[in-house]
A protein has these predicted regions:
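An acidic/histidine-cluster motif and surrounding catalytic segment
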Residues: 1-56, 60-216
């Protein structure tokens, strides 16, 4: 879903008051478009009888042995239903507040208690997609922040290390055409004076949830 160039009022499920309260800023249209793309993928997945959904953003680099590793990952998860996971992050930049589950096929699967912010490659379970569709309809934060906060709180996120995919290294067009017009992102986001404080508050809250789940 390409949200670039659209006004915020065109997104009927966007709550700008909540965004300002949580983030201290507004979302920009391309962030909302990205959110809707992920949400739409989850909804379409639930209309099928598939057990798992792989979501890859279009600006990624697929790392060596991707298909082999992905197949072994899904095979392992399919044989270990007791993990009761929602989402696997395939693109973690680093491991934070994590607990290893198993090493197979040259990589490690781990409990991502502090769920990685980089959401360019994900694997969904049906339970995870159902929960996202139910809880995530109203857009209040960028989708990667939603995933990090939600999965750090419920402890149902997993990760792989080394990552299977990574950003391609090209500049994201998250600002769309306005980037070429010299409009600063800060102004576009309508940041309040509390933006920095709220960012730190959110980070420490999510880390608290992660530590609690790690120690439980």
């Amino acid at each position: 879903y390409d949200g670039r160039g659209k006004s915020l009022s065109e997104f009927e499920d966007y709550d700008d008051v909540a965004a300002q309260k949580i983030l201290g800023r507004s979302l920009i249209s391309s962030e909302l478009g990205c959110y809707l793309s992920h949400y739409g993928c989850a909804k379409k997945f639930l209309e099928t009888d598939a057990d798992y959904l792989v979501v890859l953003e279009d600006d990624i680099q697929v790392l060596p042995n991707f298909k082999q590793k992905l197949n072994s990952l899904i095979s392992y998860l399919d044989q270990h239903k007791e993990l009761e996971w929602y989402v696997v992050n395939l693109a973690a930049k680093k491991k934070k507040l994590a607990k290893d589950i198993v090493q197979i096929d040259g990589y490690t699967i781990w409990h991502a208690y502090y769920f990685p912010i980089r959401g360019v490659g994900l694997v969904w379970s049906r339970a995870g997609a159902e929960a996202f569709v139910e809880l995530g309809k109203t857009m209040q934060v960028p989708v990667d922040i939603f995933f990090q906060s939600w999965l750090s709180k419920n402890g149902k996120g997993l990760g792989v290390w080394q990552p299977f995919v990574q950003p391609a290294g090209i500049d994201s067009d998250i600002l769309g055409t306005v980037a070429t017009q010299g409009i600063k992102r800060k102004a576009l986001e309508n940041r309040s004076a509390s933006h920095g404080f709220k960012k730190q508050k959110r980070m420490w809250r999510d880390r608290f949830y992660a530590i609690r789940n790690l120690l439980s």
